[in-house]
């Protein structure tokens, strides 16, 4: 992987990631394909959305179908018929979300499979091997996602364990030509975040992710941590904010130097009838859309908006039709890619501040005061 930074506007960055499988313009949003599928989307739909890279999940793919099935097809790209780059997360967050079903030790994590209840052990070495078998273009280290809330002591213990696992991940990654990203932890404590980042840069990685955010903390805390880290993150490496978020979170993240994002929100919300538009969120199952013959978003060029009315989408939602979830997802993912494209263009022109003002104004909102603090 090669990362080239082409333009900056304040703390915001525009660049390009180059892989053997293709190029990714940054800042970029990565649709989430947890089980090897972006829910409701054919591979060609993902391409049409403008996405250049997608995300898969090591934890879930390891449990089902298993790497042997994937390898029988070549690798994950061949299995799912997506020939662009793929980032796989290591499974640390999914293990964290198991709660009392898992037991963490220095060696790794022992847990019961949510599929059949069998005992499974996952450690940095296995996480690296699984991602190698999947053929990931970007591999994530195995870490512990610091719980929220966490005291300074609790966050420190978790962060230091993640650093030791980061070193083991790097050693196990070995001669794998794929990029390897470190993950900054430390909870909501700036000093621990700095310590985590320092430890990771001493080990040395191809990119650096910020983990442990979007785990239930107030927006103020997320922005505070991003403000703290934006001047400390290595300038020549890509920066990835994991699991974030709403369109406004992408905008605020980009303003703070983030290059990469992923989140299930556009796909999950689509299936629940919450659709993102230039004018704000549309709840398509609301009765007011029953007779609306207009498009969901007249400014959008997606297949859904170009061909179907709000009334039809409302009808599909009320009937529980699969096509409704599909058309909603096509739109939401295209909307996210449009926002990213607009951000890249604004950075390239040196007009990010104007774009941010316009982004909030077209939704009839004012930018939150906390977002303007640095």
Swiss-Prot record:
Keywords: Glycosyltransferase, Metal-binding, Queuosine biosynthesis, Transferase, tRNA processing, Zinc. It holds the Pfam family TGT. Its cofactor is Zn(2+). GO terms for molecular function: metal ion binding; tRNA-guanosine(34) queuine transglycosylase activity. GO terms for biological process: queuosine biosynthetic process; tRNA wobble guanine modification; tRNA-guanine transglycosylation. Residues 243-249, 267-271 are annotated as: RNA binding. Binds 1 zinc ion per subunit. It comes from the Bacteria. Substrate binds at residues 89-93, 143, 185, 212. The keyword Repeat does not apply. Pathway: tRNA modification; tRNA-queuosine biosynthesis. Signal peptide: none annotated. Zn(2+) binds at residues 300, 302, 305, 331. The active site is at residues 89, 262. It catalyses: 7-aminomethyl-7-carbaguanine + guanosine(34) in tRNA = 7-aminomethyl-7-carbaguanosine(34) in tRNA + guanine. InterPro entries: ArchSynthase1/Queuine_TRR, TGT, TGT-like_sf, tRNA_ribo_trans-like. GO terms for cellular component: cytosol. Its EC number is 2.4.2.29. The keyword Acyltransferase does not apply. Homodimer. Within each dimer, one monomer is responsible for RNA recognition and catalysis, while the other monomer binds to the replacement base PreQ1. Catalyzes the base-exchange of a guanine (G) residue with the queuine precursor 7-aminomethyl-7-deazaguanine (PreQ1) at position 34 (anticodon wobble position) in tRNAs with GU(N) anticodons (tRNA-Asp, -Asn, -His and -Tyr). Catalysis occurs through a double-displacement mechanism. The nucleophile active site attacks the C1' of nucleotide 34 to detach the guanine base from the RNA, forming a covalent enzyme-RNA intermediate. The proton acceptor active site deprotonates the incoming PreQ1, allowing a nucleophilic attack on the C1' of the ribose to form the product. Belongs to the queuine tRNA-ribosyltransferase family. This is Queuine tRNA-ribosyltransferase. It comes from Saccharophagus degradans (strain 2-40 / ATCC 43961 / DSM 17024). The lineage of its organism: Bacteria, Pseudomonadati, Pseudomonadota, Gammaproteobacteria, Cellvibrionales. The gene is tgt.
């Amino acid at each position: 992987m090669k990362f080239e930074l082409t333009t900056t506007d304040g703390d915001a960055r525009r660049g390009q990631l180059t892989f053997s499988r293709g190029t990714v313009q940054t800042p970029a949003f990565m649709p989430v394909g947890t089980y090897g599928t972006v829910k409701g989307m054919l591979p060609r739909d993902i391409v049409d959305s403008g996405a250049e890279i997608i995300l898969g999940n090591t934890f879930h793919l390891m449990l089902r179908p298993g790497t042997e099935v994937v390898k029988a097809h070549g690798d994950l790209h061949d299995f799912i018929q997506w020939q662009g780059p793929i980032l796989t997360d290591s499974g640390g967050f999914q293990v964290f979300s198991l709660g009392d079903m898992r037991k963490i030790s220095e060696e790794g994590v022992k847990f019961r499979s949510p599929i059949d209840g069998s005992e499974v052990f996952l450690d940095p070495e296995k996480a690296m091997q699984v991602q190698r078998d999947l053929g990931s273009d970007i591999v994530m280290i195995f870490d512990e996602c610091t719980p929220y809330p966490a005291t300074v002591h609790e966050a420190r213990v978790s962060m230091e364990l993640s650093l030791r696992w980061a070193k083991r991940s790097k050693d196990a990654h070995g001669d794998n030509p794929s990029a390897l990203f470190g993950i900054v932890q430390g909870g909501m404590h700036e000093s621990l975040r700095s310590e985590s980042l320092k430890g990771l840069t001493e080990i040395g990685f191809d990119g650096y992710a910020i983990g442990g955010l979007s785990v239930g903390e107030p927006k103020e805390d997320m922005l505070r941590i991003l403000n703290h880290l934006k001047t400390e993150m290595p300038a020549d490496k890509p920066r990835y904010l994991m699991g974030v978020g709403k369109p406004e979170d992408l905008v605020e993240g980009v303003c703070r130097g983030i290059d990469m994002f992923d989140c299930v929100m556009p796909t999950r919300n689509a299936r629940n009838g919450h659709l993102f538009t230039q004018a704000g969120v549309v709840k398509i199952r609301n009765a007011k859309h029953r007779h609306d013959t207009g498009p969901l978003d007249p400014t959008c060029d997606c297949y859904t908006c170009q061909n179907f009315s709000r009334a039809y989408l409302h009808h599909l939602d009320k009937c529980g039709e699969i096509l409704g979830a599909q058309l909603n997802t096509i739109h939401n993912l295209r909307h996210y890619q449009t926002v990213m494209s607009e951000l890249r263009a604004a950075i390239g022109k040196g007009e990010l501040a104007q774009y941010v003002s316009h982004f909030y104004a077209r939704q009839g909102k004012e930018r939150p005061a906390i977002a303007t603090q640095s």
